[in-house]
């Protein structure tokens, strides 16, 4: 298991710099992952991203040291567990 860069930054008392993704595209996710963010959040609540888009986007982000995160569209345990499995 790789180290969580965001946790390390927070423990050091520094600010985590987060990017935001609302476009359902692995190309945009890969491009953003190469820009030096600490974390990238995939917005499934207000953007056009659904689970079928979010999973490959997370895979692309995970190929870098960036920590992928997701904002689910509702506080529903099933949706949260599904994206955690991604």
State what each model feature region is.
Residues 1-86:
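Expand to "…catalyze enediolate/carbanion chemistry for C-C bond making/breaking, isomerization
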């Amino acid at each position: 298991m790789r180290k969580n860069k965001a946790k390390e930054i927070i423990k050091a008392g520094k600010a985590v710099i987060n990017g935001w993704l609302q476009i359902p595209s692995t190309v945009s996710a890969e491009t953003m992952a190469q820009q030096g963010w600490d974390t990238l959040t995939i917005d499934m609540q207000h953007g056009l991203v659904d689970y079928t888009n979010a999973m490959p986007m997370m895979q692309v982000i995970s190929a870098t040291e960036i920590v992928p995160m997701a904002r689910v569209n509702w506080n529903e345990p099933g949706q949260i567990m599904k994206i955690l499995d991604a």
